[in-house]
């Protein structure tokens, strides 16, 4: 059989096939299936700062308590980031191939904060989704 091993962004891959960021890569068990199917790495579904803020806004739009705004925004942000970190940890526990996290932010401090937390969660690399 042909040896398809390669290196991408410093990661050693068994082949150059990478499951790209999508709703399909948002589940640890499905990611294990991708690994079994032969992909060389997985890019997890992107964590979008804008999506986190939109979820907060939707929760607050009909609220009669504007003073709760800061609390709700921070709660939603922490919850969404923690869910993403759990996705990384669970996928890393199930898979032996490189796991690449992906973030999209528009505030400088969130790029840095999210990246640090993702590194600590064990992602092998980080895609900066800057579309």
Residue ranges and their predicted role:
Residues 3-131:
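Active-site entrance/lid segments in N-terminal catalytic domains of soluble metabolic enzymes
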């Amino acid at each position: 059989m042909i040896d398809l091993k390669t290196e991408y962004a410093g990661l050693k891959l068994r082949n150059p096939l990478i499951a790209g960021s999508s709703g399909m890569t948002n589940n640890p068990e499905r990611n294990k299936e991708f690994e079994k199917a032969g992909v060389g790495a997985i890019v997890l579904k992107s964590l979008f700062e804008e999506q986190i803020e939109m979820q907060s806004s939707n929760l607050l739009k009909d609220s009669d308590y504007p003073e709760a705004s800061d609390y709700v925004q921070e709660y939603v942000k922490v919850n969404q980031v923690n869910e993403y970190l759990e996705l990384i940890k669970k996928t890393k526990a199930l898979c032996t191939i490189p796991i690449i996290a992906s973030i999209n932010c528009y505030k400088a401090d969130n790029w840095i904060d999210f990246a640090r937390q993702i590194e600590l969660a064990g992602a092998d690399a980080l895609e900066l989704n800057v579309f």
